[in-house]
């Protein structure tokens, strides 16, 4: 999915923004701003909403980097990471040699999200719970928990589907049994 604007490289992997990303950025900013509207007023609420939306997408990039760096460690080429309307996607070239390798690449993204949840949750404890910074960090932590858990759902478009496919491959010895 190499469409949109190239905004940089991470570990030699080109990072792209699809034009649809701006739609979800606006939506995520709005939703998160409403969360703080009554307590902090419009200006701070919208500012916090925007920062949280950007941090959400940084989290998605870290999630995709998890997949990508594990794939690279296995000798698999990663062509790009693209952020778009539904999140992000790492364009990984080629097939895994073993079900274990496929499992590792698939589980890496959700594990990164869960580690971010844990680290951000701990970081939020350093700030008063009623502070804008503390609540914003906690909100991004919660989003990472949701991202990690959601992606483990065993549907083939999700990481959990890829995990299940790798497990079925391991059990049956057939790479394709898990997708029929």
Mark where each language-model region is.
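Hydrophobic transmembrane alpha-helices and their immediate loop junctions
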Residues: 1-180
């Amino acid at each position: 999915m190499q469409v949109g604007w190239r905004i940089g490289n991470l570990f030699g992997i080109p990072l792209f923004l699809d034009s649809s990303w701006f739609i979800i950025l606006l939506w995520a900013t709005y939703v998160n701003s409403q969360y703080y509207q009554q307590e902090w007023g419009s200006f701070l609420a919208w500012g916090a909403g925007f920062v949280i939306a950007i941090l959400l997408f940084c989290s998605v990039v870290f999630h995709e980097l998890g997949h990508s760096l594990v794939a690279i460690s296995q000798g698999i080429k990663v062509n790009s990471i693209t952020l778009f309307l539904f999140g992000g996607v790492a364009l990984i070239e080629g097939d895994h040699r073993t079900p274990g390798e496929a499992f590792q690449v698939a589980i890496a993204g959700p594990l990164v999200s869960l580690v971010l949840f844990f680290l951000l949750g701990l970081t939020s404890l350093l700030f008063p719970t009623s502070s804008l910074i503390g609540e914003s960090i906690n909100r991004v932590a919660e989003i990472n928990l949701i991202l990690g858990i959601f992606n483990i759902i065993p549907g083939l478009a999700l990481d959990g589907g890829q995990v299940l496919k790798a497990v079925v491959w391991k059990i049956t010895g057939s790479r394709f049994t898990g997708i029929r």
